[in-house]
């Protein structure tokens, strides 16, 4: 047998063993996973890994949803606290102007390229059912659809201004180190890595793993896009609902990513754990902030105040975590005074047993 070290999947312990291999312990080699089945096992692991990851994410939601919902229900008011924090405060003003300008630019582009097509399509759909009411309803629906798409584009950008808002909030709340960390962030564009080299296009792994997974995800995203399209056609309620969904393109978790990514520098695996473990509070924040974002034009201002509200929630979590827990003191037992006794305390305590 070869003495070269094998990959982790090659070794096997008893399934009920709760501890890793001890020092000097010989691993048990699976008889079915020999060197001849090395490539077959790699292909199996390529399919097994995403299934295991999805299962772990589902278990994180299942184990923490109700506890997090009970402990973090106050987060639903924090978008409105962001508004009250921003009113009359000039520290956020220049950041709000930049976000609002970027919002208006996206809204104008969306209206220019999609409004005529969307309005015509909606009129054709609503006209047989609503008659003359189809024209104003299609107009209102087109505005809401454009607002929803604009929110997705603004929040879906790797936006350094959200991080700057966190820096202002941290400075106002006395968290100097975190504020300095936010101010030193610079925008770095994404680097797209090639999944396969040219030689990999002719490998067995490409045809058995990469290509099937590509089509699975492709049709899955097509299905999601089709469901969102049907939801957008629902008058008034549809676009507002999409803004409120936590897994939609404009989910509320985008407001918290600057802290976890730019300040804590979490990788994708840890960020995914944070998202699924706290799914309940992101859901509540998505619902509350999505209602504000659905207001046309003013939604561009509310995106900035929603970021302020998210930073206030992070400040609250930091202070709650750093504040030491004080155990409750036991209630003091009432003392029975002894009338006319000047004896020491010990003798007073036994006076009722041995009276003078």
Swiss-Prot record:
Cellular component GO terms held in the UniProt record: ascospore wall; ascus lipid droplet; cytoplasm; lipid droplet; prospore membrane
Membrane topology, from the record: Multi-pass membrane protein
Origin superkingdom: Eukaryota
InterPro entries on file: Spore_wall_assembly
Regions of this protein lying in the Cytoplasmic compartment: 1-92, 137-213, 316-356
Residue ranges with Polar residues bias: 346-356
Presence of keyword Membrane: yes
Recorded phenotype for the gene knockout or disruption: A combined deletion of the LDS proteins RRT8, LDS1 and LDS2 fails to incorporate dityrosine and another yet uncharacterized component in the outer spore wall.
Region (Disordered): 322-356
Function: Involved in spore wall assembly.
Name of the protein described by the UniProt record: Outer spore wall protein LDS2
């Amino acid at each position: 047998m070869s003495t070269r070290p094998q990959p982790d999947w090659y070794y096997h312990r008893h399934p009920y063993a709760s501890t890793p291999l001890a020092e000097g312990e010989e691993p048990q080699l699976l008889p079915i996973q020999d060197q001849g089945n090395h490539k077959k096992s790699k292909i199996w692991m390529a399919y097994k890994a995403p299934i295991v990851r999805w299962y772990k994410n589902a278990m994180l939601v299942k184990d923490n949803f109700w506890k997090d919902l009970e402990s973090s229900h106050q987060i639903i008011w924090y978008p409105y606290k962001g508004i009250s924090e921003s009113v009359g405060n000039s520290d956020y003003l220049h950041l709000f102007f930049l976000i609002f300008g970027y919002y208006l630019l996206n809204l104008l582009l969306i209206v220019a390229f999609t409004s005529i097509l969307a309005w015509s399509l909606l009129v054709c759909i609503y006209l047989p059912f609503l008659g003359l009411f189809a024209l104003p309803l299609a107009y209102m629906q087109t505005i809401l659809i454009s607002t929803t798409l604009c929110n997705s584009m603004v929040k879906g950008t790797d936006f350094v201004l959200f991080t700057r808002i966190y820096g202002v909030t941290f400075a106002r709340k006395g968290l100097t180190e975190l504020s300095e960390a936010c101010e030193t962030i610079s925008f770095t564009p994404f680097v797209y890595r090639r999944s396969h080299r040219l030689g990999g296009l002719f490998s067995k792994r490409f045809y058995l793993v990469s290509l099937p997974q590509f089509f699975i995800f492709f049709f899955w995203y097509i299905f999601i896009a089709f469901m969102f399209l049907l939801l957008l056609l629902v008058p008034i309620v549809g676009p507002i609902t999409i803004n409120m969904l936590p897994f939609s393109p404009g989910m509320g978790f985008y407001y918290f990513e600057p802290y976890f990514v730019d300040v804590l520098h979490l990788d994708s695996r840890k960020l995914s754990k944070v998202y699924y473990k706290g799914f309940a509070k992101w859901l509540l924040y998505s619902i509350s902030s999505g209602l504000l974002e659905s207001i046309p034009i003013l939604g561009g201002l509310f995106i900035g105040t929603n970021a302020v509200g998210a930073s206030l929630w992070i400040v609250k979590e930091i202070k709650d975590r750093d504040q030491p827990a004080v155990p409750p003191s036991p209630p003091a037992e009432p003392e029975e005074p002894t009338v006319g006794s000047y004896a020491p305390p010990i003798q007073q305590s036994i006076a009722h047993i041995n009276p003078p």
